[in-house]
């Protein structure tokens, strides 16, 4: 069975308040190092920036686990996932902790429809490291909001890439939001999708 591999944050949901709360927690935690962090963030991911400041990813996970995940069930997402699960193996791949991944999926109402999920705790390095995409096979579909982090390696492996939100010439398809996914799948030549 072919898989759809989803990024989580800013792909399956968009919640500005949660994003702001997480960033505030990081800045408060860093204290006087926050200015260097902001400078590093211009070129590196959150985790890489923290690593360059001498913090382990476990610090980040513990910090994020304390932020309340203020999401509600998403009926449109639930309906879409139920339909897609009939034809695809549903996988979520995220850089956040296992707790945050599971809690987010539960709150959105799609945890039971996800066959597998992988968190930042499952790999030595974070996306976009190649090791994080060991589950991606040629012909799988990968959906994410950041081409470099979520889709570049899968595309190199022969996956079909769908970018959510951003403009990017290298993705196979682009959608404005996750709810447009089904309309794109109709144009992908997949023998198992009608």
Which residue stretches match the model-derived regions?
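A general structural-boundary detector
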Residues: 13, 37, 64, 88, ...
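Asp-based, Mg2+/Mn2+-dependent phosphohydrolase catalytic module
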Residues: 1-4, 82, 96-194
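Residue-level marker of regulatory loop/turn positions in helix-turn-helix DNA-binding domains and
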Residues: 73, 93, 125
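Hydrophobic residues in well-ordered beta-strands that form the structural core
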Residues: 14, 92-94, 163
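Short phosphate-binding/catalytic loops that engage adenosine nucleotides
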Residues: 55, 88-89, 110, 159
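N-terminal helical cap/lid subdomain that shapes the substrate entry/recognition surface
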Residues: 2-79, 97-99
